[in-house]
Amino acid sequence: NRIGLVIDVSHTSERSSFDAIKYSERPIVISHANPIWWHPSKRNKSDILIKEVTSAGGMIGFSIYPHHLKDGSNCTLESFSTMIAQSADKYGVDNIGIGSDICQNQPDSVVEWMRNGTWSKEIDYGEGAKDDAGFPNQPTWFKKTSDFPNILDGLKKIGFNNEEALKIMGLNL
């Protein structure tokens, strides 16, 4: 806090995340994850944690990484946008955004290196698998960063007005 760094609990456990809220003098963020109530992924976050983060002035950035999405690579834009609308109702439109977690144009060797046991002393495939250790395919509506307008369209189609949609797309930061 002293030097103004943002504390991000996207990769931390529930307990560590609550400790960060408790000890931080400033709001913290979950920069790239989704609610467990939408998809029970290892890295997605509980409703209680998201409420604590957002009620303390922090925010959540919704992840487009397939392992964090309901139906994985087959997740629809409508499903993703509906989850965002439900989250806006729960946590407030001013406390949510997009945290894509996309690894565009990265070779599978990058994710394989991350999982090779450097930190855990053993290979950890995360939500991948030994026989499919590379990056999962992105959903059809978000293959690359130039597809962000698809999300804006999805938010408007689900009922967000232009001001709300633009907040979610980045103005909330």
What do these predicted ranges mean?
Residues 11, 74, 78, 142-146:
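Soluble non-cytosolic domains of exported or imported proteins
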Residues 21-34, 115-123:
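A short alpha/beta connector and helix-capping loop motif
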Residues 1-29, 42-58, 78-94:
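Histidine/acidic residue-rich metal-binding segments in metalloenzymes
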Residues 12-18, 35-38, 66-70, 104-106:
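Active-site environment of divalent metal-dependent phosphoester hydrolases
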Residues 54-77:
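A conserved active-site cap/scaffold subdomain adjacent to cofactor or substrate pockets
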Residues 91-141:
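Short acidic/histidine-rich active-site segments
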Residues 131-173:
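Mid-to-C-terminal alpha-helical segments outside catalytic/metal-binding sites
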Residues 7, 32, 60, 101, ...:
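Conserved, mostly hydrophobic/aromatic
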